[in-house]
Structure formats: structure tokens, C-alpha cells
């Protein structure tokens, strides 16, 4: 019988007027068996925690959470703990049981003032802006400054179940061109650069130094030294009911506006604009057979999934998709990844 894996820690939960947990922030987490209640360390949230609702209608409540990593998600606090574990690099993608995560997470209005409940957002937005303006006027009066107050504006980043990673976890050695395009639960190894058009979903990410200019879908992992070109995409498991998790090996390149519905092994390249799925018919290039006029083998993309040293191209003369042997993989520019 395998030993149960657990993680634990103090979180600060945002709870709305209906008692719904909108988010939980964990500044620190621990792996292993949780201490007994009498041995638990104290939290250090101080005045960040408040049991009286603020202008958003939100209370911030300290919660001590123990997560069973191999069990389905039990509640929102459990979901946020597992998402934090991945973004903190304490658990790699596809190693935690995330079953039920969508059902346990509330849809939230994410703003520069923190999370709001969707149901009463318009009224709460006015309350926050009014309270902020009044506080600014009071400060100006006490400081002997002109009475004009800057306009306090609630800016909405999105309405979603998942927040931006960067508001909860800032991993070291990483560059992010646009914070909105990396969800909490993304795993970004040191040396990763996510450009402005890149996107990394939760339970997905990079296992080494990587360049991400395209989309890394849920469940997808990218190996060390690989490059996801601008506009490129990798099929995930959230849409269409698919169960197969695709991945990219080391020193591989998914060209600009290319895409895959299969896994790439090490030292592979998919040329720009080429999309390969499991059912794509691919011709195996053989120079000797071609010279002798013999027919070339044709296979489905699924048969090449995960294999190393392949160059996938579309023959510009006859239009067929070909797989050719490739001796070496790509090398990233080291200067771009000293983060």
C-alpha cells in the first residue's frame, strides 16, 4: 500500500457575504505529514486578516489546510493549495489529483483591489471607489494638501475561476511579458521566458530553460531547451473530452503558428505553420527509396508521437507532410534566459 502524500500550510482566504471562498493565498507551504493542532506554527497574517467585511463585502480569514495530494479536490482551499504547489515548483504538472477542481472554484471578478463576487460586483465597485476617494480626501485634509482627490478606479483583469499566477507566486529566474497570460498553477522552471503573446495554463509548464511565445495548454509539459514559437499551440485535455496528454521533449522547436496534437520527443522540429494531429497522414522520408522510385511508408501522426530526432515539414512541391531524420536539436540563446 502506497503512502499517502500530503501538503499543508496556513492560507488567507477571501470570503464573500454568501460564505463563498473566492481565493486563498498561501505564502508558504510544506510537504509531508501535518503537525498536530497543538504543534501548528502560528500564521503571520496580522492585520491582513479581518473578520469584518471590507468595502468589497469580503472578509479575509486565516485557514489551516491539509491537502491529500492523491485525492480529488475537496473544496476551494484545497484547490488553491494544489495550484500554489505547482507554481511554487513543489509539485510538477500531472502529479497531483485535480479531479473536481472546476466544480470547487467560484467564478470571480479579478481586479486591482483583489477578488470580488460576481453577483454584486457593480454595487461593490461603487462602494470601493467611494471609500478610496473619501480616504484620499481625508489624508489630503490632514496633510494640508489641496482637496482634489485622484479618481479611484477598480480595474477588472478578468472574470474567471483561475487568477493570475503572479499575484500569488513569483518564481525566481523567470521573465513574464504579460502577467495576465500565466494562470496560477503554471509550473515555470528557472530560465523560462514567456513572451507577451505566450500563454501557460494551470497544471502545465516548463521543466527547464525554455522560450514560450505560443500556447501551453493544461496538462502539457515542455522539456529543457525547447522553444514554442509565436502563435503555436499544443492540444490539451480540457476541450473535446480528450484524455491523452501531449508533451514536448528537450531541444525541440514548435515553429511559429504551428501546432501539435501528438507529443514531440527530443531534438524535434515542426516547421512554421504546420499542424500535426494524431490522425495526420505523414510520409516517412527515405532518400534511398525515393532515388530508386520505391513507394515511401505513410503512417498516422500517432505512430510518431514521442519519438526523437524528427523534422516535420510540408513538402512545398507536392504538399505532403513528411517526417525526416534530424541528428541534433535546437540551441536556445543563453543570453535571453539569464533571468
UniProtKB/Swiss-Prot annotation:
Give me the residues that bind succinyl-CoA, please.
215, 230, 233, 256, 271-272, 279, 300
Disulfide bonding pattern of the chain: none
Listed GO CC annotations: cytoplasm
Tell me if Transmembrane is a UniProt keyword of this record: no
Signal peptide residues are none
A biological-process GO annotation? lysine biosynthetic process via diaminopimelate
Tell me the protein family, please.
Answer: Belongs to the type 2 tetrahydrodipicolinate N-succinyltransferase family.
Protein name, entry field: 2,3,4,5-tetrahydropyridine-2,6-dicarboxylate N-succinyltransferase
Q: What is the lineage of its organism?
A: Bacteria, Bacillati, Actinomycetota, Actinomycetes, Bifidobacteriales
Amino acid at each position: 500500500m502506497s503512502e499517502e502524500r500530503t501538503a499543508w500550510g496556513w492560507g488567507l482566504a477571501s470570503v464573500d457575504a454568501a460564505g463563498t471562498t473566492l481565493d486563498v493565498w498561501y505564502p508558504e507551504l510544506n510537504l509531508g505529514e501535518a503537525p498536530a493542532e497543538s504543534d501548528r506554527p502560528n500564521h503571520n497574517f496580522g492585520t491582513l486578516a479581518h473578520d469584518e467585511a471590507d468595502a468589497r463585502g469580503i472578509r479575509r480569514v486565516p485557514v489551516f489546510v491539509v491537502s491529500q495530494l492523491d485525492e480529488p479536490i475537496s473544496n476551494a482551499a484545497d484547490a488553491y493549495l494544489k495550484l500554489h504547489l505547482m507554481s511554487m515548483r513543489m509539485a510538477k504538472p500531472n502529479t497531483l489529483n485535480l479531479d473536481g477542481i472546476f466544480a470547487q472554484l467560484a467564478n470571480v471578478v479579478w481586479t486591482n483591489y483583489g477578488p470580488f463576487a460576481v453577483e454584486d460586483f457593480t454595487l461593490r465597485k461603487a462602494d470601493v471607489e467611494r471609500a478610496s476617494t473619501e480616504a484620499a480626501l481625508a489624508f489630503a485634509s490632514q496633510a494640508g494638501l489641496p482637496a482634489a482627490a485622484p479618481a479611484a478606479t477598480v480595474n477588472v483583469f478578468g472574470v474567471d475561476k483561475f487568477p493570475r499566477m503572479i499575484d500569488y507566486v513569483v518564481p525566481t529566474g523567470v521573465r513574464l511579458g504579460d502577467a495576465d497570460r500565466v494562470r496560477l498553477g503554471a509550473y515555470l522552471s528557472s530560465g523560462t521566458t514567456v513572451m507577451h503573446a505566450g500563454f501557460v495554463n494551470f497544471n502545465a509548464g516548463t521543466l527547464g530553460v525554455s522560450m514560450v511565445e505560443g500556447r501551453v495548454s493544461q496538462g502539457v509539459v515542455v522539456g529543457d531547451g525547447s522553444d514554442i514559437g509565436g502563435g503555436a499551440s499544443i492540444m490539451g485535455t480540457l476541450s473535446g473530452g480528450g484524455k491523452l496528454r501531449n508533451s514536448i521533449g528537450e531541444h525541440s522547436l514548435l515553429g511559429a503558428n504551428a501546432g501539435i496534437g501528438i507529443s514531440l520527443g527530443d531534438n524535434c522540429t515542426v516547421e512554421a505553420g504546420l499542424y500535426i494531429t494524431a490522425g495526420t497522414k505523414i510520409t516517412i522520408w527515405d532518400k534511398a527509396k525515393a532515388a530508386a522510385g520505391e513507394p515511401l511508408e505513410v503512417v498516422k501522426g500517432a505512430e510518431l508521437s514521442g519519438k526523437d530526432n524528427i523534422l516535420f515539414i510540408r513538402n512545398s512541391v507536392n504538399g505532403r507532410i513528411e517526417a525526416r531524420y534530424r541528428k541534433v536539436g535546437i540551441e536556445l540563446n543563453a543570453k535571453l534566459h539569464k533571468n
